[in-house]
Amino acid sequence: MQLRWSHALVHVTAMDAMVVFYTNVLGFEVTDRGDVGGNEFVFLSQVEPDHHQLGFSATREQRGRSNNVAHFAFRVDDLDAVKTMHEVLTQDERVTNIMPITHGNAWSVYFNDPESNGIEIFCDTPWHVAQPQGGPWDPTMATDDIITATRSAFEGASEFGPINDYYDERTSHLEQREGGQT
C-alpha cells in the first residue's frame, strides 16, 4: 500500500496573523473555518481539489516542548486500505492512542507513533461536508455498513454533497483565480 502525503495540522497561538501570512505571502486560500469545543480551526489549500493542505488549530501552548504540529496525514486509496491499516496498528504495541474518526468527508485512523508524533491515515468518502466536524466509526464493520452509517450521520450536515461536485467547484475556482492573475 502506498502512502501519499496529504496535509499537516499545526497548533498556532496567533490565528489571524498565521492566516494572513499563509494567504497573502504563500498564496493559500481559506477553504473552511469553524469552532470545535471552543477551539478555532482554519483549513487552507492551494492545490486542486484538496480541501486542505494545512490546518491551523488555535491550541498551541506558550511554553514547553515543541507542540505546534498536531499530526501528519497520509492518504490511501480506499476504505479497505484504512481498515487494513487499523488492523495492523492495533496489533503493534508501539502504537498508542488509536482513534478511528470520520469527518464526513474522510474515514481516518489517528494514532501516535513510537515517539508520540500524531499520524493520520485516511481516504476520502464519496461526500464533501463543511469542516470541522467528526465522530467515531468502527473499522471492524463491513465496508458497505460503514458507508451507510457515515452517510446517515452526515447527510444533514452543512454543504453535504458529492465529493466530485466539490472537487469540480474547487478546480473551477482555482482556474478563475489563476486566470485573474497578471
Task: Please state what every model-predicted region is.
Residues 22, 63-66, 86:
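A short alpha-helix capping/helix-coil boundary motif
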Residues 35, 56, 135-136, 162:
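Intrinsically disordered, low-complexity regions
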Residues 1, 12-14, 40-42, 58-62, ...:
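Residue-level detector of functional hotspots within protein domains
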Residues 2, 10-51, 180:
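Core segments of cupin and vicinal oxygen chelate
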Residues 9, 32, 48, 60, ...:
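Short, flexible loop/turn elements at secondary-structure junctions
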